[in-house]
Amino acid sequence: MSSVLNPSSPHSWDLCCSSSSNRSYHRPTHPIVGLLVGQLSVVLLIGAFIKFFIFGEAPPSPSRSQTHRTSQHKRSYSIHGARDLSPRTLKEKPSSNVLRPVPSSSTNTRSILRKTYYSANPTNFPSKHGRHRPHHSTHQPESLDWFNVLIAQTIAQYRQTAYILKDSPTASILESLATTLNNPEKKPSFIDEITVTDISLGEEFPIFSNCRVIAIDDPNSDGGRLQALMDVDLSDDNLSLAIETNLVLNYPKPYSAILPVALSVSVVRFSGTLCISFVPGTTESSTNLTPTSSNIDTNLRSNELRGKTAPQESSTTDEGSQGGATSTTGIPKTSLAFSFLPDYRLDLSVRSLIGSRSRLQDVPKVAQLVEARVHAWFEERVVEPRVQVVALPGIWPRMGRTGVRGQEEQPDVSSSDAAGVSGAKVSMLGSRDTGAEMLHAAREVDAEGLRYRRNPPPGDKGSSSKYAQQNQSSRERGRADDPFRIPGSLPDAVPIT
């Protein structure tokens, strides 16, 4: 008992040493265990993040608008779409079969109407005058306010362009009308040269409304094709054309008598139903829609008779006559066909002035003849069953059609076509892109001069001087075209004394 209580005894010293040694042996184990637990928790967190955030499936994105209309329609997948759900490998098929075939049901009229949630009645086609008269669809007619704004902007741009190019010798609307009216193959011999005295492109815009889509039968397409019908109305506009000419009596000798005639035709009101449909770009349709060889030969002969005064117009006519629904490379394009139903309304106001001394004004018979001729011209071109077919341009993005909206105002456009095109290009690209193009051209000039910087043969001083002159001239042109060059010369160096 005394040995235990006495700290100076040897047995008590041994017990104290053994207990202290045990505490010092177990004390370092706690930091190691904590370090291992911390590392393990970090690894687990990283693994959970990779699994659930990186390789996890993305949640379905909510729709932008939960309207009553979208909640009613449920997409039904066809049997053709079930095969696409199976996983595909990158090298499952050869490279020649990369483009998947389009099933015939995807271009069917019923499939298009079902996928776009548009209801249309199956149409019956009682024919009248060789024209099919379809029933209207059960879908409610739609307003075309946005379309009216788009068409109004397009017409306004055409009017502005026609006014800017009014003094152009080749691209003006006045020159085009004069050339068309004085066509020697269509103008009779008793009519002298026709002069256009006044043109008014109007100030109002057509209003489209009551748009509906119908399905009609078409033997060239599977399941028929779709056609859009819309009402168009244009009234209270000053769309007019005034001309002057002479009626020539060529008997018993040429120009035996001359009767001056002045006519003015104005559109008071136009209303009708516009039909729009798309013609697929197949080889058969492009063959049927392109003009015949006889028409092309007739156009070529008429261009030869005009002479060399309008070469640009003749080339444009040839391209337009040969283009049709087929591109210049021979690949058929999808075309837009539009026409008007026969129940259209075209009210004209015709004013006439005949004679030089004793003049007859507003002759009713002349007005009747002019109105009949205008109606016949309109019906021969855009009234059912005749349609106008326009090849749609390619909408694939290309660098040649890429532009940047200019930050500066559009400069004044001169009368020449080149100045008008260049001014429009400068305003579209902006000053920054124009400067970049000029700098690029200057660099090309310098690069062109590098080709001639080879060492000339020994003893040939003429070639070396020629190369030096070429390099010097190219550098001067490059400096002159450089828009970032600081004008003026640098100050002279100050000598250090």
UniProtKB/Swiss-Prot annotation:
**Low complexity composition bias: which ranges?**
412-421
Q: Where is the composition biased (Basic and acidic residues)?
A: 81-94, 440-451, 474-484
InterPro entries per the UniProt record, alphabetical = Mmm1, MMM1_dom, SMP_LBD
Topology of the protein relative to the lipid bilayer: Single-pass type I membrane protein
Superkingdom of the organism of origin: Eukaryota
List keywords of the entry alphabetically: Endoplasmic reticulum, Lipid transport, Lipid-binding, Membrane, Transmembrane, Transmembrane helix, Transport
Location relative to the cell: Endoplasmic reticulum membrane
Lumenal compartment ranges equal 1-28
What GO biological process term is on the record, naming one?
Answer: mitochondrial genome maintenance
Where does the sequence pass through the membrane?
Answer: 29-55
Q: Where is the composition biased (Basic residues)?
A: 66-77
**Chain positions covered by the region annotation Disordered:** 60-107, 284-330, 402-421, 437-497
S-S bridge residues = none
Location, primary (coarse class): endoplasmic reticulum
Task: Note the PANTHER family from the entry.
Answer: SMP-LTD DOMAIN-CONTAINING PROTEIN, TEX2 PROTEIN-RELATED
Query: Can you state the subunit structure given in the record?
Result: Homodimer. Component of the ER-mitochondria encounter structure (ERMES) or MDM complex, composed of MMM1, MDM10, MDM12 and MDM34. A MMM1 homodimer associates with one molecule of MDM12 on each side in a pairwise head-to-tail manner, and the SMP-LTD domains of MMM1 and MDM12 generate a continuous hydrophobic tunnel for phospholipid trafficking.
Q: What does this protein do?
A: Component of the ERMES/MDM complex, which serves as a molecular tether to connect the endoplasmic reticulum (ER) and mitochondria. Components of this complex are involved in the control of mitochondrial shape and protein biogenesis, and function in nonvesicular lipid trafficking between the ER and mitochondria. The MDM12-MMM1 subcomplex functions in the major beta-barrel assembly pathway that is responsible for biogenesis of all outer membrane beta-barrel proteins, and acts in a late step after the SAM complex.
From the Swiss-Prot or TrEMBL record, give the protein name: Maintenance of mitochondrial morphology protein 1
What is the name of the gene encoding this protein? MMM1
